[in-house]
Design a protein with these regions (language model features):
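Short alpha-helical donor nucleotide-sugar binding micro-motif in glycosyltransferases
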Residues: 208-209, 216-221
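Glycosyltransferase donor-sugar binding loop
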Residues: 174-189, 207
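Short hydrophobic beta-strand element within catalytic cores of glycosyltransferases
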Residues: 246-249, 259
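A short, well-ordered alpha-helix in the C-terminal region of glycosyltransferases
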Residues: 275, 282, 289-303
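Aromatic "clamp/platform" in nucleotide-sugar-dependent glycosyltransferases that forms part
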Residues: 229
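Nucleotide-activated donor-binding/catalytic signature segment of Leloir-type glycosyltransferases, i.e.
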Residues: 188-209
């Protein structure tokens, strides 16, 4: 959503953004307050809709914006949203019905959420491709990159297990794990796992880095690991593809809708260290595989470039502000 906000500002749109708070309660309260206080200053609202506790705030905003007579678009987020909708179908259906438009960033969410509203529109997560320098990996080295928040659903502890399996045959293997600690104990469990399997010295964890530094961090590696147990269309994977990294990912959620196994990535079962290590071995030893994955990954990422996605957003916003549904 931050990238969209920057693009809208650059195009001359007057924006009010909420919320900068990380705490769920403070964040939700700030969004509701902003919707009321600035109701005379905005023509429409764009609201991210997540599952779990975060759904409550999207639901409350939908009721409030409807009462205020302000049109709004929902942007569906998170790989857990379909499971949440199956548990609370009437609630989700009622919430989505209030929106002028509902968009999904992936074919996965589009397909899974269609039973709850049948006119959901596909609007891919955009990427500023010019920020990512492409480097073809014809002879990839065991320099591994992991980019995600340290949270249980992303299964960061799997990564050091994979490194442990590779270290015997690839003594120079090294893993860089980039991302903030979300405070659920995953950071500590990952560290403990690395120590237990004897690879703590092969893993760097710089923590979270500013977004502008991510392209340079990705360029330093050759193989990207996506270890998640739940996913939609991860921007981190798109960023890795844009730089030409060879992607190895778990086959979960919306990932198979984004990646084609054997063409632009290698897909493995979730929480399977041996399968992920085997996929990495293939990339390191199988002639031509790394180059094919690298080249095709960049080509796939180009479909998500801002110049491709931006006209779709412009058309959508114009339709909403004209007061009719596309």
């Amino acid at each position: 959503m931050e990238d969209l906000a920057d693009r809208l500002r650059a195009a001359g749109y007057d924006l009010i953004c909420a919320s900068p708070y990380r705490s769920g309660l403070a964040r939700g309260a700030h969004m509701l307050t902003a919707a009321i206080l600035y109701r005379q200053r905005y023509d429409l609202a764009i609201v991210d809709l997540y599952s779990g506790k975060a759904f409550l705030w999207g639901e409350a905003l939908a009721v409030l914006l409807t009462a205020l007579g302000r049109p709004f678009a929902f942007v569906l987020r998170g790989g857990n949203l379909p499971d949440f909708a199956r548990r609370w179908p009437k609630r989700v259906r009622s919430c989505l019905a209030r929106a002028s438009v509902v968009t999904a960033p992936s074919g996965y969410l589009l397909e899974e959420m269609r039973p709850y509203r049948n006119d959901i529109q596909l609007m891919p997560n955009p990427l500023n491709l010019s920020a990512y320098r492409f480097r073809l990996r014809p002879h990839p080295q065991p320099r591994l990159i992991w980019l995600r928040a340290f949270h249980e659903i992303y299964n960061p502890s799997l990564a050091p297990k994979v490194v442990g399996l590779l270290a015997r045959d690839f003594p120079d293997v090294h893993l860089t794990m980039i991302g903030p600690d979300k405070g659920d104990g995953s950071w500590q469990r990952t560290e403990q796992t690395a120590v237990r399997v004897g690879v703590a010295g092969r893993i760097s964890r710089p923590g979270g880095v500013p977004k502008v530094q991510i392209p340079a961090c990705l360029e330093a590696g050759d193989i990207f690991l996506n270890t998640t147990n739940v996913d939609n269309t991860p921007v981190s994977v798109l960023e890795a593809m844009a730089t030409g990294l060879c992607v190895v990912s778990t086959r979960v959620g919306g990932v198979p809708y984004l990646l084609e196994d054997g063409q632009d990535a290698l897909l493995v079962p979730p929480d399977d260290a041996e399968a992920m290590a085997l996929a990495i071995r293939r990339i390191l030893t199988e002639p031509g595989l790394g180059e094919r994955l690298s080249r095709n990954a960049r080509a796939k990422a180009e479909r998500f470039n801002w110049p491709t996605v931006w006209p779709q957003w412009q058309a959508l916003l114009a339709e909403i502000t004209r007061g009719r549904q596309p």
